Amino acid sequence: MSVLNFLSEETFNEQMDKANQYLKYIAAGVGVGYTPKSFAEIQQQVRAGRHKELFSVGDQIICTRNNVQIVWDIIGMDIDTPSDPQYTHSLTLLMHEPYDFIQFGAPQAMYYAETELAAGTYNVTPKNGWSGGMGNGKTYQFTLTKPVPAGGQIVWNGAWDKDPLNYKINTYSGPTSTAVIETVVPTEGSEGTALATINHPHRMCYGSNNYKESAIRQLINSDKAAGSVWTPQTNYDRPPNWNTSKAGFLNGLDADFLSAIGKTKKKTVRCRLIDTGVDETNDKFFLLSRSEFYTGNEYSDVDEGTPYPYFANYSDYTSPNTGADKNRIKYKNGAPQWWWGRTPTSGHANYVRHVHTTGQLGYSGASDTYGGVLACNII
């Protein structure tokens, strides 16, 4: 009499799953327990569409930048659209922790001189700002003793909660200049020539929340040395506080890793307080939108991207949320950090969405400095 050892359903399913995994490895032409030997090999698997069989969301890939390791988490597969239409697959990576702490963009100028602005008395009325600070609707005057050349700027920064008269006015020869032509003191009044075309008070005080035009976008996609990364994108732009101290992210980045990264098509809504429409960017490295890290869209009629499985599948919530979520927390040296997104807030022209130390959705002025957590795609 023979004894038949029947497998339980659970054991049978486990063994079938293991067998199926072996078959996947065989079909992909790689060994069981696949470990890629190069970034180029990973790229080959992605282009062949085999990456979903070989990798899992949450797997990590490591590269170096200036001999410092950068750990990347796989956060999605075939979620993003490559900029180059000949490719259809993508493997999305996100830094496990901030690689640096970066100002999104500097406070902007108030006025740009299309032609030379002669010495004399002028007045401005910053509007639609803060009732207790810059943009309170009052008219202020000031007198220049030196002309502002064509292409020059008048800078009056201020704050949301302080009397604009607490701040002096500086003039510069252009957006890249840091040498002040002269400093003058404003007073309340309407004497002289009105300068009708001026920047929004939010951006005068705390910078612009336009990602496409931002300084941080230039930094994370540049290979240039410090001092050569940033160039003004608008007439009101001013140099970021890292302009002379930070090299572009690509400077010193592992060349083999960089060669496997392709440009990704992304869209970012513009702040409707002062603008309309949606910007498209095609970059190798980018910041995540709020929808991509599972906090929903800023505007209900514009989708800035599908939530990555890394955030959606392991969230503390079952639907997109703006609350504290441990899966969104990024650490540096053991401490939780704020980190930048790319989405502008709807109600202010300066605020940019970020992730709080609790994983909660937040916002802050572009002139603040927070963690740079970059995303990219092997394509």
Please provide the spans of the model-predicted regions.
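Short, low-complexity N-terminal tether/leader segments at secretion or assembly junctions of large
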Residues: 1-20
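Collagenous Gly-X-Y triple-helix signature in extracellular proteins
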Residues: 17, 21-379
